[in-house]
Amino acid sequence: MLRSDADITAFRAVRQILLLVSKVELPVTPRRELEALRGYIETDASLEEIPELPLQEFKDASRALLAPYLAAVESRIWSGDWIPRHSSGALATREMYNSRHSFRTWTERLQSFLLWEDELAFSYREIVDNLDDFSVLAPDQEPPSKVTTVPKTMKAPRIIAEEPVWNQFIQQGVLHVMTEVIQEPRFRRLADIFSWLDQEPNRELARVGSVDGSYATFDLSEASDRVSLQLVEALLAQHPFLKGVVLASRSRTAKLSTGDEIVLKKFASMGSSLCFPIESMVFFIIEAIAWAEHEGMVPSALRVRGLPRMRVYGDDLIVPQAVAQILPRRLETYGLKVNSRKSFTTGPIRESCGADWYLGSDISVFKLRVPFPEAEHQFETISRTIEFHNNAYSAGWFLVAGQAELSLNGIFRKLPRVPVGTRLSALWSWDQVDSGAVRLDPKLQRRQ
């Protein structure tokens, strides 16, 4: 129980000590990994058909609020004003590096909306030259996405899916169009409410809520795994071409490391390039439906300009206090689950997008994510240890930062020091700055 006159400095210090190593990314035991994979299967199996009335309300709200935006995205893809692309993520079909740019496989589902001759070939000559070694897979020939685990905490791993190369190629292209369109001036108000680009509005709104209680913050459990295919089909119902492209680039089955293969009832697992933006839209629509209920409106009467200040970033939701009791019930209607441990509707604490607030004071903590490095080849671990050092140093925990620095000094003779806040992979310092190592020479491609 928190005292009403709690000292902010003491409160922040206690939280920092207790949470410092709460999310170290270490491999879990085989038993915990198996439990996580079983939970993945059980969650997907638990997704039920959404009742007709709530589903229609969802369609009505989607049409009222997102039709212009989704139509603009659809128009870009339909007209060919887009470029499918790859990301650096691992692939279920195992292509590495440059080989992912020369794949020779497509699917009938994709071909129904996007001809491989248009999306993959640079010229008619290339089409002719590749006809013999190009294959178009029937739906029952498509490989599943590959579900795997990566370290998250010592309690449970994070579960992600690796997509086949052709699916990822299209997903990334659609994501790029969605991102460009949402940044257009005509959709500024929409972007103020939901986003997959900027967390700061969430953090600021959470701060305001901690001061006057005017906003409630919600976190969802298993958010990606609980967004059903049925819900996404309803979201895109008025845009058949866009819906076709999105669903054709979606893996319908998933294969787990246990050997189990399941037909997915969810829209997509974490790892799909469209998982985050699509779920952001879904959660935005549900927030709006909750507001409509509070106002006594039908969802079809909703308008973007008539909505109050609210916010969605992935599964971090913020709504006015007036709908704080309505939203959880609405979320559950659509198969979603509120994480009550990380949701705050009353009291002086609010949390969103990694920022924690108590009566307007920042009580966020820094966390050790990986064990300290032991060798030069641990590039990512070294980079993240430098980041940990800088977070600890800027927060005033100099002895903790010193331990990180000692581990790095055991590998490198000397790491450069730069002013606090500098965006370089170097140790932050308030005073001991190596002035000759704070500029990146673009020609020599090294720090000067």
What feature does the model see in each segment?
Residues 1-148, 414-448:
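Non-catalytic, polymerase-adjacent accessory regions of viral genome-replication enzymes
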Residues 126-448:
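Core nucleotidyl-transferase/polymerase catalytic module
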